[in-house]
Each structure stands twice: as C-alpha cells, then as structure tokens.
C-alpha cells in the first residue's frame, strides 16, 4: 500500500509547543518547516483543535516531566472527541524517557528524539496508517539539522546553529547524554545560512551552540569561532550578531578582539557562571575557577567598556555551604551583571550530581535563592540607572512587552541586549516590528529601560516591510560547507520532504 501525505487530502493543521532553551526554540522552527513542507498548515489561534500537536520538550528542570504529562492529560479529552488528532512528543525529555512516554500517556501517537527531527512527518503518517504509536529514538544524528527546512518565527532576528551536542561533562547537566558529542558545522555552511536569512530581510542573527568557544575543534581550528565572527562582519545587511553560550574554560582572547573589532558584533556577552565557589565549580566539573571567570570579564570590559554581561547561576548544588554561597554573592558583586538567570538546583536522574551526598534541604535552597535574586536585582538596577539620559538604538520586536497594549508603548532590544519599552510619540502607527528606532532612556528598572520621549530617529527596514506584509522568512536546508571561513557558498537544493547552555 502506498502511504499518502498530508497534502494528498485536505490540509491538516499543526501546532508546536516549545519548552526549554534556545536550542529547542530553533529545533521547533525546523519542526514547523518540516511539517509545512509535508503539506500541513499552521493552526490559527482561533482554530478549535489542531490535527497535530507537537511537544518539543526540555529535560533540564525538575518539573519538566510533570509539565509534559500534565499537558498531555489536558489534551486527552480533545483526542477522544477528535479521533483523527495526533500528538507527538520530541526533544530532550523524549530522548530520555522514550517508550515510557507512551506507557504513561498511551494516547500519544509519536515519540521522536533529538537526533531524528527530520523523521517526524514520516512517523506521523506511519502512526496514522498503522493506528499504533511510533517510537523512534536514535543514538546519533541521522542528518545534520541544517539540512532541514525552517519556518522562522521572526522577520527581523534568527537563530543559526554552529554546532550541536556538547563535549563537557558537567555533573548537573543531562544535555550531553541527550544531544550527544559536539559536532560542528563548517563555516561555509553557517555563513550560507546567515546570508540566506539576510536576503530575507533579517537584521540580527544569534549564533547558537552548547559551547561556542569550542567551535572548530572538530575540524582542527581552535580559533574558528573568532574567525566566524569576523566573517559575519563582511555580510552586507547584517546589522547585529550575537552568540550563546560560551564556556569560560575555552574563552580565548581572539574572540574578545573579534567582538571589539567587528562593528556588527554586539557588545553583549552571556557567559554562565553557575557558582562563584571554586569548591562547587570543582564538584560541578566546570574546569575553571572564579578568578579565571572574573579575568575574562575584566578583559571584555577593557576592550568594550559598554559591554553588557549576563550569566546563569545555580543555587543549592549538593554540598554547597553558606561560605560557598557567600562566595557566589562576592563574584556577582564583582562582575556587576546586567542580568542573570538564576536557578534552584534541580536533581536530574542520570546525572552524577543526582546521587551526590549532601543534597540540600529545600528551605535552605529557597532562602539562598531569594538572597541571590535580591543581590542581582540591586546590581542590575544600578547598572541600568547609569543609562538614563543615554541614546539607545532599539530593534523593534514583537511580544517583548507584556504591558505594551495597556501602556501604549512599543518594545525592543538595544544593541547590548537590554529590553527597552519606548513611546512612539508622533510616529505611532508608523513603526513596525523589525524597524530601528533611536530614543533616549528616561527611566530604569532592574529588568528593563523606559524611553518615554519622542523618538530621535526611525528607520524603516526590509524586516519591517516583511512584518507589515505578514511574511515570515523560510529557509531551505543548507548542506555542509567547506571548512574554510568565508568560503563562497555552493547552491544547494531544498531538503527532500521525506526527510541548554553550558
């Protein structure tokens, strides 16, 4: 019997629900691109029940399991009322739990992992044809994700993966076990995708990897990441380049120089600290110490005095003492972060930290967490207040300001990554997402800036034109390029339709 595709009958609708890090956000763009290439249509907000719901899951946080199974339970009545509806579960939790998902939620139709996203359309068809769940988990990549089509969510900003997987062995992290060892894309491949996005009107690109500073080791060039940043500087129309996440143990001076000397590379750095205690860092197997971390920040600020530095911090790691925690506060005060993502330690089965002695009581972790948040907010507020009266360039965004409709403001990101809510003034109705505005900061809060005066300048952009027309950038798959920074891209055909930070 010949299997039919979704496009062979009336178009089926889909919805992707994403949990977790930027890797998952970008993977979800590829999932959407695959489904649309196979003939599915994205479900609108007003649609009753999508024909296919895909959960792209995270396995890093402790409540990831509860969140997934709670949402699956909420969908069961809809599935019972609509027998043709399909539910698929992918991502890191699917890679970890595998057939356990179907055992706990037998109404799930497809389970796929982090290494075989491209198989999703075929698995959906097979499950529908056989009226049985399809569970397919691979231990390594079947195709590099860059070969898959992508439906981008933003007209003005895009993610570009430079690598997948991770070679580090942090004791709290399950990501390497779920996404595998690091595999690097060739620079020519990365630059081809960046150029394709810019050709679609995208102004800002974020280079994405579990550890961007180890990029190039696979093909024998430990300075490849700095070269890649400089090569991005040669792409006409690319106004902003960001990257996430670097690892302090691999951070080199050539990257700092590339950031400082390449005009379109933003002076913003997100570099996870995790802990300020050397003893805790050793237990985490982080391979650097607080002195090195602060030394990198000192070099970054010497080269770029306006740099905004953000971080990740874990509180309550097994064995963390009060003295260890105080050392973390000391490093936070010295580093003066412009923002910090703070987390209470979450025990993940399968990680070395999960079986360590001296797991801390929840009340102790909560109390330290609250003190850390208070310390961070005091510093970020002070750092933001220094910008009152300064002119900032804002790339206008969608969905950044939760109160924009009530306040009448628009929102976007400054070049250093800070969130800015601004008054459009006499330009109300003319400024679109993707446009660029220059405005003056009038107020600072711990997590954002306000600019309530008349904008000083407004520049219409191709990204704004695309947003106004309701277009979304769609990029075909990009095949592996040559291991030479700046190598001219070769034409590539579209991919066949059958096809978290350290």
From Swiss-Prot:
One GO MF term attached to the UniProt entry: metal ion binding
Annotated localization: Cytoplasm
Binding site for [4Fe-4S] cluster 1: 21, 58, 92
Co-factor remark: Binds 2 [4Fe-4S] clusters. One cluster is coordinated with 3 cysteines and an exchangeable S-adenosyl-L-methionine.
Enzyme class: transferase
Chain segments carrying region Disordered: 451-502
Ranges of residues in domain MTTase N-terminal: 12-129
Positions of the Radical SAM core domain: 152-383
InterPro entries, per database record: Elp3/MiaA/NifB-like_rSAM, Methylthiotransferase, Methylthiotransferase_CS, Methylthiotransferase_N, Methylthiotransferase_N_sf, MiaB_methiolase, rSAM, rSAM_horseshoe
Cellular component annotations (GO), alphabetically ordered: cytosol
Co-factor(s): [4Fe-4S] cluster
Record SUPFAM superfamilies: Radical SAM enzymes
Superkingdom per UniProt: Bacteria
Protein task: Catalyzes the methylthiolation of N6-(dimethylallyl)adenosine (i(6)A), leading to the formation of 2-methylthio-N6-(dimethylallyl)adenosine (ms(2)i(6)A) at position 37 in tRNAs that read codons beginning with uridine.
Complex formation: Monomer.
Protein name per Swiss-Prot or TrEMBL: tRNA-2-methylthio-N(6)-dimethylallyladenosine synthase
Source species of the chain: Salinispora arenicola (strain CNS-205)
Lineage of origin: Bacteria, Bacillati, Actinomycetota, Actinomycetes, Micromonosporales
């Amino acid at each position: 019997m010949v299997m039919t595709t979704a496009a062979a009958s009336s178009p089926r609708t889909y919805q992707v629900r994403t949990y977790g890090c930027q890797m998952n956000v970008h993977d979800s763009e590829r999932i959407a691109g695959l489904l649309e290439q196979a003939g599915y249509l994205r479900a609108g907000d007003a649609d009753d029940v999508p024909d296919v719901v895909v959960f792209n899951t995270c396995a890093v946080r402790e409540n990831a399991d509860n969140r997934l199974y709670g949402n699956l339970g909420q969908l069961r009545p809809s599935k019972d009322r609509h027998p043709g509806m399909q539910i698929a579960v992918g991502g890191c939790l699917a890679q970890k739990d595998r057939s356990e998902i179907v055992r706990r939620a037998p109404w799930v139709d497809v389970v796929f992992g982090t290494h075989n996203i491209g198989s999703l359309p075929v698995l959906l068809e097979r499950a529908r044809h056989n009226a049985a769940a399809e569970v397919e988990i691979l231990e390594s990549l079947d195709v590099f994700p860059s070969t898959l089509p992508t439906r981008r969510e933003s007209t003005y900003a895009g993610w570009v993966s430079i690598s997948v997987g991770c070679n580090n062995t942090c004791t709290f992290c399950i990501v390497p076990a779920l996404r595998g060892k690091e595999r690097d894309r060739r620079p020519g491949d990365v630059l081809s995708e960046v150029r394709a996005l810019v050709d679609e009107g995208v102004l800002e690109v974020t280079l994405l990897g579990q550890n961007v500073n180890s990029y190039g080791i696979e093909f024998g060039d430990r300075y490849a990441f700095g070269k890649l940043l400089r090569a991005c500087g040669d792409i006409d129309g690319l106004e902003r380049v960001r990257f996430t996440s670097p690892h302090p143990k691999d951070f080199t001076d050539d990257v700092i120089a590339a950031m400082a000397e390449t005009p379109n590379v933003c002076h913003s750095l997100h570099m996870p600290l995790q802990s300020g205690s050397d003893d805790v860092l050793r237990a985490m197997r982080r391979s650097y110490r607080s002195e090195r971390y602060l030394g990198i920040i000192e070099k970054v600020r010497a080269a770029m005095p306006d740099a905004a530095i953000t971080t990740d911090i874990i509180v309550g790691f097994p064995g963390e003492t009060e003295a260890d925690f105080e050392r973390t506060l000391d490093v936070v005060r010295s580093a003066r972060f412009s923002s910090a993502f703070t987390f209470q330690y979450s025990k993940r089965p399968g990680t070395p930290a999960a079986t360590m002695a001296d797991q801390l009581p929840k009340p102790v972790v909560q109390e330290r967490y609250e003190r850390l948040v208070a310390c961070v907010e005091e510093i970020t507020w002070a750092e933001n207040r220094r910008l009152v009266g300064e002119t900032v360039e804002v790339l206008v965004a969608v969905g950044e300001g939760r109160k924009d409709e009530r306040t009448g403001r628009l929102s976007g990101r400054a070049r250093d990554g800070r969130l800015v809510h601004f008054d459009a003034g006499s330009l109300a109705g003319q400024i679109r997402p993707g446009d660029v505005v220059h405005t003056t900061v009038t107020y600072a809060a711990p997590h954002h800036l306000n600019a309530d005066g008349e904008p000083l300048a407004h520049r219409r952009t191709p990204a704004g034109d695309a947003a106004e027309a309701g277009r979304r950038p769609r990029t075909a798959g990009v095949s592996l390029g040559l291991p030479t920074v700046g190598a001219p891209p070769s034409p590539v055909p579209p991919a066949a339709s059958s096809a978290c930070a350290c």
